[in-house]
């Protein structure tokens, strides 16, 4: 053994070849600060070996290196910029020394080589991968860019176009595609990976392969003539702005950095990369996006804990077909859980089966499944007008019309036909679970399972715990949601649960703005372009369905009369009374026609202004800040109340429910991250200016207390014990 640390070992093979093996204590290898320092120490040892002829890098895990340790990111980003800069210079010196070894080097890549893992293999002369390997640089998805030389080496290895596509989009690619673009030199079966790598290395040692020629382009300026460069980078910048927009600066920064570095060799190009990385790391967007990654890990970890030792059901059932029931049945069947789909109406069953078939057809068109698999999946959805076979289901999801009497009757009826262990769940969006549980003899077996529309696209499932719901029931439903490929978040019961409870105050803020003379089009524009929502409130109401929203608004008003009841007609009432239900009937706040692909196309409708004049002040211009404050303060206050009342268990779960369930702008990170970013004291001071608008604008006491003590919702990232920047002699 030449060198050994907790995460890597260095030892001799035959023929003067040394092997560097990444083997961290956990299930995966990460390129954390300690491993980077250890790599530097191993290289010091290697540099002293006069008999060294070649170096092989490999992993002892199922994946090569999954990336940097993202749990360290917020701590690193909290370091003073000059210290982070210093550490990056230190780290890059290590990768340069790997690249500059006076012998040929090769990486044998199995599984993932992402982020820092990809940057590590870019520093070797040759790369060989197994077929399941995935290689890429996902940093821009976290609000940063490659920091270990990825933006320097990848363009010089692949050419600018292919490299920009990977870096700007934060992509990873499979082994065969990596071979096509020149990212790897060979793809071989996993059991032959090391032998193939050694064969290439020995050919290089024997002079049959020119390893110095393989290395040289990575050290030199990018080979692009001025015309090619202008075209390549102009197109890339245009596409990035179109896709990422102004709220996500990392992709454009990466493209501009690669462009600026194109005329330089490695040393100067790395300086530009580091100079671009440090400001991105200190940005609010990076903190928010890294926070989302960490929160996602936390939420998935909570789901694992809650469903520990519990398997997903072998058979499920959905009561109520149509679009929603069909969507749930499709998702269940697609992920391997056969499902009975029951409805009293043959037309609804046809609609549900057609929905499942349509979604499977899309999978077929994209090459995700073949015709046989499609037929097999569809065969696991059993449509029925009666309860035949219902006793086989371990979990039954009720998805009938959003009417408490109808839901209660259906649940009570099915309970008489099933075993004492069978779990019942309601896909209600607003009706309290405790209210529905009154119709059941076994309320401990009952909970809410709120899917979001469209089911196949929306990652969140709200699992609602009623007063009498057992832990066993929650475990079964969480396991089912996880098997379906969803992110389950458990919330406690109240009208609207969490997501809809906090959505309707936002829509109420919109309604009050329109009442006071704001143009709904301006509100939509500001909330989309400035705040970053995927759609503004008027457009959202049209997509959800104004009849659906009108009904839910009434339920919320009964549930929270002190805040959500209103004594005036608003824009939603006017739309509803005039049967303008949104996209579903082609007219709402906007008019909808079909585009060439059959999708609804939004257009202005002048009739709407005349209708809204019944309930609005004369049109007047509001500032962007006013529009954002008047819509967001009610939502933010309600989100905080949900935490204070124990409806949600943590800021992380609240923020992920908002991002996954409502499309809350990821670059803000969720309401709690947003509050931490602007500061609770600043928020309270701003909200004070709007308290005259009513109860929705009153800041909850817990948030006032945080403001007084200058506290945050997320813990401040602890400083890393030792970010080593000294190289042993």
From Swiss-Prot:
CDD domains: crotonase-like (cd06558). Residues 1-189 are annotated as: Enoyl-CoA hydratase/isomerase. PROSITE patterns: 3HCDH, ENOYL_COA_HYDRATASE. The keyword Lyase applies. It catalyses: a (3S)-3-hydroxyacyl-CoA + NAD(+) = a 3-oxoacyl-CoA + NADH + H(+); a (3S)-3-hydroxyacyl-CoA = a (2E)-enoyl-CoA + H2O; a 4-saturated-(3S)-3-hydroxyacyl-CoA = a (3E)-enoyl-CoA + H2O; (3S)-3-hydroxybutanoyl-CoA = (3R)-3-hydroxybutanoyl-CoA. It comes from the Bacteria. GO terms for molecular function: 3-hydroxybutyryl-CoA epimerase activity; delta(3)-delta(2)-enoyl-CoA isomerase activity; enoyl-CoA hydratase activity; long-chain-3-hydroxyacyl-CoA dehydrogenase activity; NAD+ binding. Pathway: Lipid metabolism; fatty acid beta-oxidation. In the N-terminal section; belongs to the enoyl-CoA hydratase/isomerase family. In the C-terminal section; belongs to the 3-hydroxyacyl-CoA dehydrogenase family. This is Fatty acid oxidation complex subunit alpha. It comes from Yersinia enterocolitica serotype O:8 / biotype 1B (strain NCTC 13174 / 8081). The gene is fadB.
């Amino acid at each position: 053994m030449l060198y050994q640390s907790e995460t890597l070992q260095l030892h001799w093979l035959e023929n003067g070849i040394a092997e560097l093996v990444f083997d961290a204590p956990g299930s995966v290898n990460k390129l954390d600060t300690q491993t980077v320092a250890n790599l530097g120490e191993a290289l010091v040892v290697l540099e002293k070996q006069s008999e060294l002829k070649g170096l092989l890098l490999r992993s002892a895990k199922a994946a090569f290196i999954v990336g940097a340790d993202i749990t360290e990111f917020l701590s690193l980003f909290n370091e003073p910029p000059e210290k982070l800069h210093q550490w990056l210079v230190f780290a890059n010196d290590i990768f340069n020394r790997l690249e500059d070894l006076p012998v040929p080097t090769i990486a044998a890549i199995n599984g993932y080589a992402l982020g820092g893992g990809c940057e590590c293999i870019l520093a070797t002369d040759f790369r060989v991968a197994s077929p399941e390997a995935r290689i890429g640089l996902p940093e821009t998805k976290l609000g940063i860019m490659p920091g270990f030389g990825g933006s320097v080496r990848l363009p010089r290895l692949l050419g600018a176009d292919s490299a920009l596509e990977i870096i700007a989009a934060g992509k990873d690619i499979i082994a065969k595609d990596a071979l096509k673009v020149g990212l790897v030199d060979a793809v071989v079966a996993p059991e032959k990976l090391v032998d193939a790598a050694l064969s290439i290395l020995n050919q290089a040692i024997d002079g049959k392969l020119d390893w110095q020629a393989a290395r040289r382009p990575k050290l030199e300026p990018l080979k692009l003539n001025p015309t090619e460069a202008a075209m390549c980078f102009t197109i890339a910048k245009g596409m990035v702005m179109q896709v990422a927009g102004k709220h996500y600066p990392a992709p454009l920064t990466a493209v501009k950095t690669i462009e600026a570095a194109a005329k330089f060799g490695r040393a100067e190009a790395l300086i530009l990369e580091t100079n671009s990385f440090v400001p991105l790391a200190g940005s609010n967007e990076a903190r928010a996006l890294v926070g989302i990654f960490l929160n996602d890990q936390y939420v998935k970890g909570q789901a694992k804990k809650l469903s520990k030792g519990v398997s997903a059901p072998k058979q499920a059932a959905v009561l109520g077909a149509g679009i929603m029931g069909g969507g749930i049945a499709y998702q269940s069947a697609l992920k391997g859980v056969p499902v009975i789909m029951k409805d009293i109406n043959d037309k609804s069953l046809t609609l549900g089966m057609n929905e499942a078939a349509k979604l499977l057809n899309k999978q077929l068109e994209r090459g995700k499944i073949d015709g046989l698999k499609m037929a097999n999946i569809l065969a696991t959805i059993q449509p029925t007008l009666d309860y035949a076979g219902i006793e086989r289901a371990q979990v039954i999801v009720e998805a009938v019309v959003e009417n408490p009497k109808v839901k209660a009757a259906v649940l009570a009826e099915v309970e008489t036909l099933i075993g004492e262990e069978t779990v019942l769940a309601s896909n209600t969006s607003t009706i309290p679970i405790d209210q529905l549980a009154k119709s059941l003899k076994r309320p401990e077996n009952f909970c809410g399972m709120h899917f979001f529309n469209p089911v196949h696209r929306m990652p969140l499932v709200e699992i609602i715990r009623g007063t009498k719901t057992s832990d066993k029931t929650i475990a079964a439903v969480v396991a089912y949601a996880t098997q379906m490929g969803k992110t389950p978040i458990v919330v406690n019961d109240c009208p609207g649960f969490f997501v809809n409870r906090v959505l309707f105050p936002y829509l109420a803020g919109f309604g009050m703005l329109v009442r006071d003379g704001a143009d709904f089009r301006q509100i939509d524009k500001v909330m989309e372009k400035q705040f970053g929502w995927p759609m503004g409130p008027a457009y959202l109401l049209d997509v959800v369905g104004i009849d659906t929203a009108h009904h839910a608004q009434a339920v919320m008003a009964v549930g929270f009369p002190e805040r959500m009841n209103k004594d005036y007609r608003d824009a939603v009432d006017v739309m509803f009374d005039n049967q303008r239900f949104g996209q579903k009937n082609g007219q709402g706040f906007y008019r909808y026609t079909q585009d060439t692909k059959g999708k609804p196309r939004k257009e202005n409708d002048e009739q709407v202004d005349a209708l809204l004049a019944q309930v609005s002040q004369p049109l007047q211009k509001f500032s962007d800040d006013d529009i954002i404050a008047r819509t967001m303060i009610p939502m933010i206050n309600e989100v905080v109340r949900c935490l204070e009342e124990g409806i949600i268990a943590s800021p992380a779960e609240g923020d992920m429910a908002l991002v996954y369930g409502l499309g809350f702008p990821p670059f803000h990170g969720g309401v709690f991250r947003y509050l931490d970013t602007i500061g609770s004291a600043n928020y309270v001071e701003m909200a004070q200016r709007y308290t005259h608008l009513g109860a929705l604008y009153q800041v909850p006491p817990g948030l006032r207390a945080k403001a007084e003590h200058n506290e945050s919702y997320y813990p401040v990232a602890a400083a890393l014990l030792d970010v080593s920047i000294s190289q042993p002699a």
